[in-house]
From Swiss-Prot:
Family: Belongs to the frog skin active peptide (FSAP) family. Cruzioseptin subfamily.
Species of the source: Cruziohyla calcarifer (Splendid leaf frog)
Tissue distribution of the protein: Expressed by the skin glands.
Protein's recorded name: Cruzioseptin-2
Residues of the propeptide: 23-43, 70-71
């Protein structure tokens, strides 16, 4: 009977250890996904900033050309 108890405790302990390891790996993967999403968001923001600056510059040039044409 004592042998069965020890075996059962060993199996339960090993099961808990493997479950803990799986949970840790899952958390690490989720953190990596969040970090990748953050990186992609930063790239999008950078791209949108470039587009905004190009648009402002183009608007300035067009405005300047229109003002020259009116004079």
């Amino acid at each position: 009977m004592a042998f069965l108890k020890k075996s059962l405790f060993l199996v339960l302990f090993l099961g808990l250890v493997s479950l803990s390891i799986c949970e840790e790996e899952k958390r690490e993967e989720e953190n990596e996904e969040v970090q990748e999403d953050d990186d992609q968001s930063e790239e999008k923001r950078g791209f949108l900033d470039v587009i905004k600056h190009v648009g402002k510059a183009a608007l300035g040039v067009v405005t300047h050309l229109i003002n020259q044409g009116e004079q």
